[in-house]
Amino acid sequence: MEIWTVLEDFHKTRQLLENASNGVSHLWRFCFGGDLAKLVYRAKQDYREQFEDILRECPSLFDALNLGHQSHFNQRISRALDFTTPGRTTAAVAFFAFIFDKWSQETHFSRDYQLDFLAVALWRTWKCQRLNAIPATCRYSR
Protein backbone atom coordinates (compact mmCIF):
# COMPACT_ATOMS: atom_id res chain seq x y z
CA MET A 1 0.00 0.00 0.00
CA GLU A 2 3.04 2.25 0.23
CA ILE A 3 2.88 2.67 -3.53
CA TRP A 4 -0.58 4.20 -3.27
CA THR A 5 0.73 6.73 -0.75
CA VAL A 6 3.58 7.67 -3.09
CA LEU A 7 1.20 8.15 -6.03
CA GLU A 8 -0.84 10.65 -4.02
CA ASP A 9 2.05 13.12 -4.26
CA PHE A 10 3.28 14.27 -7.68
CA HIS A 11 6.87 14.90 -6.58
CA LYS A 12 7.14 11.47 -4.97
CA THR A 13 5.66 9.91 -8.12
CA ARG A 14 8.26 11.69 -10.25
CA GLN A 15 11.07 10.62 -7.92
CA LEU A 16 9.89 7.01 -7.97
CA LEU A 17 9.85 6.94 -11.78
CA GLU A 18 13.31 8.44 -11.91
CA ASN A 19 14.76 6.04 -9.33
CA ALA A 20 13.23 3.03 -11.11
CA SER A 21 14.64 4.05 -14.49
CA ASN A 22 17.84 2.96 -16.17
CA GLY A 23 19.11 6.52 -15.88
CA VAL A 24 19.96 5.89 -12.22
CA SER A 25 22.90 3.69 -11.30
CA HIS A 26 22.42 0.47 -9.36
CA LEU A 27 24.52 1.90 -6.52
CA TRP A 28 22.33 5.01 -6.28
CA ARG A 29 19.15 2.93 -6.39
CA PHE A 30 20.52 0.58 -3.71
CA CYS A 31 21.74 3.33 -1.36
CA PHE A 32 19.24 6.12 -1.90
CA GLY A 33 16.40 4.90 -4.11
CA GLY A 34 14.39 3.15 -1.46
CA ASP A 35 12.72 -0.24 -1.35
CA LEU A 36 9.82 0.80 -3.54
CA ALA A 37 12.10 1.98 -6.36
CA LYS A 38 13.96 -1.33 -6.16
CA LEU A 39 10.65 -3.22 -6.34
CA VAL A 40 9.44 -1.21 -9.34
CA TYR A 41 12.82 -1.66 -11.07
CA ARG A 42 12.64 -5.41 -10.48
CA ALA A 43 9.07 -5.55 -11.81
CA LYS A 44 10.20 -3.60 -14.88
CA GLN A 45 12.86 -6.22 -15.53
CA ASP A 46 10.52 -9.15 -14.87
CA TYR A 47 7.77 -7.86 -17.17
CA ARG A 48 10.07 -6.57 -19.91
CA GLU A 49 8.75 -8.96 -22.57
CA GLN A 50 5.11 -8.19 -21.79
CA PHE A 51 5.84 -4.46 -21.90
CA GLU A 52 7.56 -4.88 -25.27
CA ASP A 53 4.47 -6.70 -26.58
CA ILE A 54 2.20 -3.89 -25.41
CA LEU A 55 4.36 -1.27 -27.13
CA ARG A 56 4.36 -3.29 -30.36
CA GLU A 57 0.57 -2.81 -30.43
CA CYS A 58 1.15 0.97 -30.47
CA PRO A 59 3.80 1.32 -33.20
CA SER A 60 3.53 5.09 -33.59
CA LEU A 61 3.49 5.92 -29.88
CA PHE A 62 7.01 7.32 -29.67
CA ASP A 63 6.66 9.16 -32.98
CA ALA A 64 3.57 10.92 -31.61
CA LEU A 65 5.29 11.72 -28.31
CA ASN A 66 8.33 13.10 -30.14
CA LEU A 67 6.02 15.43 -32.06
CA GLY A 68 4.46 16.60 -28.80
CA HIS A 69 1.14 14.81 -29.32
CA GLN A 70 -0.15 13.46 -26.03
CA SER A 71 -3.64 12.30 -26.91
CA HIS A 72 -2.54 8.99 -28.44
CA PHE A 73 -0.54 8.19 -25.30
CA ASN A 74 -3.38 9.17 -23.00
CA GLN A 75 -5.98 7.19 -24.93
CA ARG A 76 -3.93 4.04 -25.50
CA ILE A 77 -1.71 3.82 -22.44
CA SER A 78 -3.00 5.91 -19.54
CA ARG A 79 -6.59 4.76 -19.79
CA ALA A 80 -5.52 1.11 -19.73
CA LEU A 81 -3.76 1.34 -16.37
CA ASP A 82 -5.12 -0.71 -13.49
CA PHE A 83 -4.59 0.45 -9.91
CA THR A 84 -7.00 -1.96 -8.20
CA THR A 85 -4.31 -3.78 -6.19
CA PRO A 86 -0.83 -2.83 -4.98
CA GLY A 87 0.64 -5.44 -7.35
CA ARG A 88 -1.14 -4.06 -10.40
CA THR A 89 -0.23 -0.55 -9.36
CA THR A 90 3.43 -1.58 -9.11
CA ALA A 91 3.20 -3.08 -12.60
CA ALA A 92 1.66 0.16 -13.94
CA VAL A 93 4.48 2.24 -12.46
CA ALA A 94 7.02 -0.27 -13.81
CA PHE A 95 5.45 0.08 -17.26
CA PHE A 96 5.83 3.86 -17.11
CA ALA A 97 9.46 3.46 -16.03
CA PHE A 98 9.93 1.09 -18.98
CA ILE A 99 8.38 3.65 -21.35
CA PHE A 100 10.66 6.31 -19.89
CA ASP A 101 13.73 4.15 -20.62
CA LYS A 102 12.61 3.36 -24.18
CA TRP A 103 11.60 6.92 -24.98
CA SER A 104 14.91 8.27 -23.66
CA GLN A 105 16.74 6.30 -26.34
CA GLU A 106 14.93 7.90 -29.26
CA THR A 107 13.93 11.47 -28.52
CA HIS A 108 15.18 15.01 -28.75
CA PHE A 109 13.29 16.07 -25.61
CA SER A 110 15.19 16.53 -22.39
CA ARG A 111 15.15 13.85 -19.73
CA ASP A 112 13.38 16.25 -17.36
CA TYR A 113 10.60 16.91 -19.89
CA GLN A 114 10.07 13.18 -20.41
CA LEU A 115 10.08 12.52 -16.69
CA ASP A 116 7.63 15.36 -16.01
CA PHE A 117 5.30 14.27 -18.80
CA LEU A 118 5.21 10.64 -17.65
CA ALA A 119 4.94 11.53 -13.97
CA VAL A 120 2.02 13.90 -14.64
CA ALA A 121 0.26 11.29 -16.78
CA LEU A 122 0.73 8.59 -14.14
CA TRP A 123 -0.19 10.83 -11.22
CA ARG A 124 -3.24 12.28 -12.99
CA THR A 125 -4.51 8.86 -14.05
CA TRP A 126 -4.05 7.59 -10.49
CA LYS A 127 -5.97 10.55 -9.06
CA CYS A 128 -8.77 10.21 -11.60
CA GLN A 129 -9.20 6.49 -11.05
CA ARG A 130 -9.17 6.93 -7.28
CA LEU A 131 -11.97 9.46 -7.63
CA ASN A 132 -13.81 7.19 -10.08
CA ALA A 133 -13.95 10.21 -12.35
CA ILE A 134 -12.35 9.12 -15.60
CA PRO A 135 -15.50 9.13 -17.78
CA ALA A 136 -16.58 12.64 -16.87
CA THR A 137 -13.94 14.90 -15.38
CA CYS A 138 -10.63 13.40 -16.40
CA ARG A 139 -11.10 12.98 -20.12
CA TYR A 140 -7.97 13.50 -22.11
CA SER A 141 -8.79 15.79 -24.98
CA ARG A 142 -5.88 17.22 -26.90
Curated annotation (Swiss-Prot):
This protein's name: E1B protein, small T-antigen
GO biological process terms held by the UniProt record: symbiont-mediated suppression of host apoptosis
Protein family per UniProt: Belongs to the adenoviridae E1B 19 kDa protein family.
Keywords recorded for this protein, A-Z: Apoptosis, Early protein, Host cell membrane, Host membrane, Host nucleus, Host-virus interaction, Inhibition of host apoptosis by viral BCL2-like protein, Membrane, Modulation of host cell apoptosis by virus
Compartment list: Host cell membrane; Host nucleus envelope; Host nucleus lamina
Record's keyword annotation contains Transferase: no
Alphabetized Pfam families for the sequence: Adeno_E1B_19K
Function field: Putative adenovirus Bcl-2 homolog that inhibits apoptosis induced by TNF or FAS pathways, as well as p53-mediated apoptosis. Without E1B 19K function, virus production is compromised because of premature death of host cell. Interacts with Bax protein in cell lysates.
InterPro entries in UniProt: Adenovir_t-Ag_E1B_19kDa, Bcl2-like
Annotated signal sequence range: none
Originating species: Human adenovirus E serotype 4
GO cellular component: host cell nuclear lamina; host cell plasma membrane; membrane
